[in-house]
């Protein structure tokens, strides 16, 4: 992006943070806040039911501390909430953030400390900027400094992981008005939107992650969530997604990603290890990505509106489908779409990798695939 003058830069940071707040706006029910407060330790700012020493790789227990402070922050800053402007709740947020900084919980799964935790902290701090009282500058600064030190660097990762780390770089850059970090983060969001023979968007319009694994769903979900999210934040600014990147993204989403979803359910062949998760084929929540794209890629807005109607259940699974047969020569995957049915074939191939297992997920189907 072109350099901005001081006034323009200030306005852009405020605009980006306003869009981020709108994206995550929530009004936590008072009952949930009251339940969380029952286990709040007034002495040190911890929660008595959270195991801060746990390092388990999935459903990491200490993250509950951040999730509760996150809800407290939105309750404190949301007009109409019974805790809006509540000074006692504000004091608990401050003490809770101080406790988290001093305790510095660590997870054996890097994802929690480099993606989940810093993303939530960034959003929370952006929201708290709207409060009647501001958290101490020293507390905000040291929290953000640790996020920068321990939260990873997007350039060291690929695909969805790169985008997810870049997101909290964006949050931190807005809070600190650091144009260099903001530019780096945006580059790392947009740079993966290229055709490659490595991990990422393939020349046949499929998507690979973790080597040569077909991951149209799973990691495909994540990278689309992150890219469309950032593209909406930067829409109408000098940081907007480049047109050629938007075209590649839209082609993948319209012709591959949403083509593997029948009605609201995704074909299981493209889900990776996530196939073992309950109700994972239900992709109705991905209507959000299509809604974003209808605004970003207005030339194909009607196509996205049809996708949204199918995912929301307002139209049947056949609505606006055009018969199409596609063989993905990089993925060794075939997709056949008709108004009345859809089927796919994922081939046994030496050019691709079979579905993985990891983080306690998918050991059974991985073993069966080996048989």
Regions found by a protein language model. Give the residues of each.
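Residues that form generic nucleotide/phosphate-binding pockets
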Residues: 19, 23, 35-40, 146, ...
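Aromatic-lined, polymer-binding surfaces characteristic
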Residues: 37-277
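N-terminal export leaders
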Residues: 1-2
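Low-complexity, Ser/Thr/Pro/Gly-enriched N-terminal "stalk/linker" regions
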Residues: 5-63
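Extended polysaccharide-engagement surfaces of secreted carbohydrate-active enzymes
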Residues: 230-371
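Short amphipathic alpha-helical segments that mediate assembly, nucleic-acid/protein binding
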Residues: 9, 13, 17, 30-33, ...
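Intrinsically disordered, low-complexity segments enriched in polar/charged residues with Gly/Pro
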Residues: 33, 97, 320-323
